[in-house]
Amino acid sequence: MYYIKKTIEVAACHRLELSYPSKCTNLHGHNWIITIYCKTRKLNADGMVCDFTHVKEMIHGKLDHANLNEVLPFNPTAENIARWIVDQISSCYRADVQESENNIASYEED
């Protein structure tokens, strides 16, 4: 099995829709650090799991300097964003979404 890991930084804002009172329901921003993990049994014709630049473009191009509530079709929690990233990239099996030094959400396919 071949593996790659790509880390990107995204500056974006969001507000959460929650069932309880929270400051996170107000519009606020993060300098997100997103780590994307991809794997494959067989390298592509170029000898890669996938191109690091393409991985970055697929996520960074859509999320950077965006209001996540306007570009994503779900409540933009870190957990939901991690799942969305895995769904966007065919060879991706895990994503870590870090909204601050102490708050990180991960999604990994079984």
Where do the protein language model's features map onto the residues?
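Charge-rich, low-complexity N-terminal segments
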Residues: 1-110
